[in-house]
Amino acid sequence: MKRSYKDIIRFLKLIGISHSTAIKLVDGILPVMIGLKTSYLVDCVFLEISELREIIEFVGPDCLRGIYFTEPISQCFVLHVANWEEWSSIDSLVPIVVDLPSKKQNRLLQSCITKHVDRLLDLCKRNLSTFTIDISSSWRQNIIENNEQKEFECTSTAITGCLLNYGATYNYDHTLFKDNGLSCETLKLYTLEVHSKKKDVSDTLIQFSCVNQFEEPVTSNIQRLTSLYQTRWKRINSEEKRNWEEWIKHKYKIPNDTNIELEFCFSVTDRKEQSVIL
């Protein structure tokens, strides 16, 4: 059995991480550790690369890896290797790629985006716990189109959405455009949640937005993703299920002797914000 949430909190405090940050990290890492989620994006304000390495080595280096992106912005990911292999092997889960600010579908990048991220998987397999990568110099692609060779870049924004298993991801170059074109526009917000049947638990697992014109294919994508989570939950062993359920009870202040039955569902809602930062 892997570490319990109490073990992880104690360890995080031991290496100098505050209680509030430890709670956030456990909430994000635990679903990945037990094999439910594929990945977790850690706020780099909370964590240094050396701390991420220590956490991965403590929690479970057999299945988890840490990826630290240094450019163009710092990002930390905790990744479940087997879950990533599973997700990337299912063609129907490849995200819709939307170029910004044009809001047009990038079918070319969409056809090969998982190949970009599969490079990370290869690096994961060759590293014991954590590694650092500079995306800005690593994600150029040469392709043949109409008998002509072209080069294009997969941006860090697109890579991030793919790593997080979003049903849609934006390809946006911060160096070329000051405005991503999403501010004050009504977007569709897609949310995959876990609920208890008594409705005393509602925990968000994946959440992302996309422009309205792609609602139909993206909704189909998150339906398939929900089914994948249901399948993963069924195959997780009873000890690891109990580990996460105990955390859920602790988080929502549910008595320990209460039996909670968890189920997965998704929702699609409208969202408009004054400013959308990618």
UniProtKB/Swiss-Prot annotation:
GO terms for cellular component: cytosol; nucleus. InterPro entries: DUF4504. PANTHER family: UPF0739 PROTEIN C1ORF74. This is Uncharacterized protein C14F5.01.
